């Protein structure tokens, strides 16, 4: 039985992410990806012309999901409920994508790819803190939103916390995010 084009592409992206974790985006070559997959470099080129395209494709599903979280939150009338929806969605996304988040937080190569993939769209990274603070936020609230976002991402992708189970990590990330944002603790 042969692998389908989609299966190969998925394996390629998973392999690339694993190599990015070890070597960084800049330290990973197309040849390294091909070797790790057991295919030729030409087979990698069949799916992606450049490493930048691979890097963007690795980040794209999570960015698309984050954008959907923000779009859905925008339909919620109460600002407090929007904040809860965004924070819960972000925490869930971070916990499910720990390895990607770790690379994103530590490797400028993936950060550049994310910026390229957001080109021409309303920037998710601008919408995210704005959704947490609302339109009339003061400087303190804006700083708190950025600290909460950075903290959730950095802690969620921290190698020191990789052994923690998803449920426990998610609960703690949500609790800390709420405290930073001055939100009430979520009831169990």
Question: Each PLM stretch: what is its role?
Answer:
Residues 1-7, 184-188:
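Actinobacteria-biased recognition of intrinsically disordered, low-complexity terminal regions
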Residues 3-7, 49, 53, 57, ...:
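Residues at secondary-structure transition points
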Residues 11, 15, 19-53, 57:
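Helix-turn-helix
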Residues 15, 19-22, 65-73, 151-155:
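Solvent-exposed, amphipathic alpha-helical segments
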Residues 57, 68-102:
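Hydrophobic alpha-helical connector segments
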Residues 73, 77, 108, 159-160:
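Secondary-structure edge/capping motif, primarily at the C-terminal ends of alpha-helices
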Residues 101-102, 106, 114-126, 131-188:
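Hydrophobic/aromatic-rich alpha-helical bundle segments in the mid-to-C-terminal region
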């Amino acid at each position: 039985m042969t692998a389908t084009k989609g299966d190969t592409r998925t394996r390629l992206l998973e392999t690339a992410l694993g190599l990015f974790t070890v070597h960084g985006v800049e330290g990973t070559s197309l040849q390294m990806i091909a070797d790790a997959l057991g295919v030729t470099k030409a087979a990698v080129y069949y799916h992606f012309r450049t490493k930048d395209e691979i890097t963007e494709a690795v980040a794209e599903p999570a960015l698309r999901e984050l954008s959907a979280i923000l779009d859905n939150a925008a339909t919620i009338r109460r600002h407090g409920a929007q904040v809860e929806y965004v924070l819960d969605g972000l925490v869930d996304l971070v916990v499910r994508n720990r390895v990607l988040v770790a690379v994103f937080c530590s490797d400028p190569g993936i950060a550049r790819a994310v910026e390229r993939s957001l080109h021409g769209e309303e920037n998710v990274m601008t919408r995210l803190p704005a959704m947490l603070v609302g339109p009339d936020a003061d400087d303190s609230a804006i700083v708190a939103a950025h600290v909460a976002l950075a903290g959730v991402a950095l802690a969620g992708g921290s190698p020191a916390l990789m052994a923690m189970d998803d449920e426990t990590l998610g609960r703690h990330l949500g609790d800390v995010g709420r405290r930073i944002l001055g939100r009430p603790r979520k009831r169990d």
